[in-house]
Amino acid sequence: MRSLKLAEGCKGTQVYALNPSAPTPPPPPGNSSTGGGGGGGSGGGTGGVGDKLLQHLSDHLRVNSVRSKSSRTYPPPTQPNAVVSPEFLLPCGLPVTDLLEPQIDPCLKFVDLVEKMAQVYRRIENCSQFEKSGAYLEQCAIFRGISDPKLFRRSLRSSRQHAVDVHAKVVLASWLRFERREDELIGTTSMDCCGRNLECPKATLVSGYDPESVYDPCVCSGASRSEMMNEDECSTSQEVDYDMSFCIGDEEVRCVRYKIASLSRPFKAMLYGGFREMKRATINFTQNGISVEGMRAAEIFSRTNRLDNFPPNVVLELLKLANRFCCDELKSACDSHLAHLVNSLDEAMLLIEYGLEEAAYLLVAACLQVFLRELPSSMHNPNVIKIFCSAEGRERLASLGHASFTLYFFLSQIAMEDDMKSNTTVMLLERLVECAVDSWEKQLAYHQLGVVMLERKEYKDAQRWFNAAVEAGHLYSLVGVARTKFKRDHRYSAYKIINSLISDHKATGWMHQERSLYCSGKEKLLDLDTATEFDPTLTFPYKFRAVALVEENQFGAAIAELNKILGFKASPDCLEMRAWISIGMEDYEGALKDIRALLTLEPNFMMFNWKIHGDHMVELLRPLAQQWSQADCWMQLYDRWSSVDDIGSLAVVHHMLANDPGKSLLRFRQSLLLLRLNCQKAAMRSLRLARNHSKSEHERLVYEGWILYDTGHREEALAKAEESISIQRSFEAFFLKAYALADSTLDPDSSNYVIQLLQEALKCPSDGLRKGQALNNLGSVYVDCEKLDLAADCYTNALTIKHTRAHQGLARVYHLKNQRKAAYDEMTKLIEKAQNNASAYEKRSEYCDREMAQSDLCLATQLDPLRTYPYRYRAAVLMDDHKESEAIDELSRAISFKPDLQLLHLRAAFYDSMGEGASAIKDCEAALCIDPGHADTLELYHKAREPNDQK
């Protein structure tokens, strides 16, 4: 670990496994067990418990076949030591291959992702400043497809930064807020401001293009309207020379003729244009739909241009008057004034009708802003649904410039997350289609509507929308066309579609995965193996192979197959499958561990073909597993910590939270583990729960700081840490401050300050899990400062409290002291202790000769194909051996499923050295799409473009 900002220096706890090597799975159960309960000599007593479990499960399936929330509790089985046959826990039986099929990704997916990323980069660079927001939105759609939340949020921020009109600012700022799910934070309101113009609900209502100011502090906490008044109310002042009156009913409103005339051309024509009213001192205004209070307000505005002291109902009257008599300045003032009054859902529901009727652009924008900042709860309000979902509602919004692709892109994503099959989702996607103009917009809208229709089993409509997406240029939608044909018993037709796709284009993992559905036997397995070779992150091939092994009664091999992907990707569906098979093997401890882990990732997960809630399976399995007290759980957590078993650690924390759900410290640890597993969405949910359950203000501030830091708000996170320290000195506050400060290139003074902060953290009370991490990070800073002996002391102290990752830091110290053998041995110790040890093999490769390094890196890739260093090393070795094409192939293999910045940069450099300028430029552009400020890539890009620029 070179610095705190590297992956190995993650702030998260490294929580480790009880047994570094998993035990050999027991053989599959035989068929000799009786129907009463277990396969043993327990007799009738066991059968009675089995009957209770069966009845319990059957009742659950009958009454609660579909459940959407996890908040219910279930009565556990009464006997804790029962021996129960798997049949009672699996009334649906074991999984079968015939029921397995991969989901179609609802996001944009490309045959040549690198080319698409390069195109988007060129579009962003070459378009006008007023088109940049839309270009960044397309980039958002691409990054959504590669499941990188940080890249997605960065593009979304850029889209908001370059937004010009109020509507786009409102939608994009609300979307940014939703991505942090601040609606889940107790004690906050939808209109709370984060302190920057980027998301400030008042700043979004200011039109104009000013990208440089979006990160400035906002002025929403400045002076109120009343404080801005610099003159007294003067509507009845004797200094005013009234020269006419408007008569409304029995009352008169005295006015200044030329002031009223200045409100609009119609008023000027009426009062000075030869009409009979020109000669009258009193004009009857009774039939013009305005009250005496309204007319008095109009008179005051005509002299002061202010609306500050008028109640909303009077301002609404003025808005109507302004529309009737074309008073543009008055209308603009009323629109702005009313817009700044909208702060709640009830106010927004009331005022949006006035806004739409009176064509008040800002007022409607303000109401929309409340609806959007109240998401997802506002999506369940029938009045909000009517405005957003109906064709009439969209037309009304469009008449004011408030129906956009951006709006419906945002809304449809939320609806699909909430319920893919709902009518609301369908209607929002239909509105999205109506708003789609650009090619990529049509591709996305058509494809997503096809996916939803497929989920609803409306196959003809699904096929129609998938075909439309293909015609718009989205080749991945051919997967949807083939699937809908397959569902309608046109299997051969489906096969031909995907076979042609593979023949006509460079094959990808998802192509072979899809074709496997439409063939059988060895051909199916060959396609699945090819899919894994092209893209090892696809979960379906592992699941299918595992279930095929189960069908052959090879349970241990099935578990081993799933372990391959779960070693580097915490996939809920693979955890479910492993738990399912474990129950069949009567490994209830293993099943319970996996179910607890997947419920941490997805709390509302429905298991076994959406039949049983995961929480219910926990209740059924819990009596069959070893019972732990909270103290036992802490010991288990330490054991898993020391053997780098993150999934096992998640299961232990889930168990502990079941006993103490309000423990914010446990929620925080859970979030850190999830970040280590690259499950950011679940991690942020745990962080929010930690913040909500915090018992003190200083603790709450720390969790708020981590939320801000993890969503890209480093300065705000530092401020939270400092505020927490000012209230009470604590380990976590000092650690947060040190971590946030270290997330940059440190000069000597900054490094010394980070060292002081970590030393202060270590003086504060905490447990060994966190102190080990602090010692590890402190050692990293000492290494960067070339204080190797102090670093070695830190790593040694960390190892004494079972912070196993410290072996890696100590190995680096040995390496810097030219003790290469000691460094190698230190990494070997980590490999022996760690259950997840791909990174350890990768790091050990730095401390041995080329042949041994190659061996270690091959193992690292086998264990975790997402690690990019092994590909880069092997490619560099091939280039040194003048095997250019093999080096390019090595990098391309990884880029095809992980378009990584470093991989793209290295391949671009190789292309440049080979004289293939066009390929080098394309890879540079794709890399700059990921990080537009990457200095080395920018330098290479300009160099590769020089021949073209000279031409």
Swiss-Prot record:
Coiled coil ranges: 815-854
Keywords: Coiled coil, Ethylene signaling pathway, Repeat, TPR repeat, Ubl conjugation pathway
Composition skew (Gly residues), residue ranges: 33-50
RNA-binding listed as a keyword: no
Listed Pfam families: TPR_8
UniProt region (Disordered), positions on chain: 15-52
SUPFAM superfamilies found in the cross-reference section: POZ domain, TPR-like
Domain of life according to the entry: Eukaryota
Ranges for the TPR repeats: 443-476, 539-572, 573-605, 698-731, 772-805, 807-837, 868-901, 903-934
Tissue/organ expression: Predominantly expressed in flowers.
Pathway per the UniProt entry: Protein modification; protein ubiquitination
GO terms (BP aspect): ethylene-activated signaling pathway; negative regulation of ethylene-activated signaling pathway; protein ubiquitination
Record InterPro entries: BTB/POZ_dom, ETO1-like, SKP1/BTB/POZ_sf, TPR-like_helical_dom_sf, TPR_rpt
UniProt domain BTB: residue ranges: 242-342
This protein's record includes keyword Disulfide bond: no
Phenotype of the disrupted gene, per the record: Compact rosette with smaller leaves, reduced petiole lengths and shorter inflorescences.
Complex and partners: Interacts with the C-terminal domain of ACS4, ACS5 and ACS9. Interacts with CUL3A. Putative component of a ubiquitin ligase complex containing CUL3.
This protein's domain notes: The BTB/POZ-like domain may mediate the interaction with some component of ubiquitin ligase complexes.
Biological function: Essential regulator of the ethylene pathway, which acts by regulating the stability of 1-aminocyclopropane-1-carboxylate synthase (ACS) enzymes. May act as a substrate-specific adapter that connects ACS enzymes, such as ACS5, to ubiquitin ligase complexes, leading to proteasomal degradation of ACS enzymes.
Family statement drawn from the similarity comment of this UniProt entry: Belongs to the ETO1 family.
Name this protein carries in UniProt: Ethylene-overproduction protein 1
Naturally occurring in which organism (per UniProt): Arabidopsis thaliana
Taxonomic path: Eukaryota, Viridiplantae, Streptophyta, Embryophyta, Tracheophyta
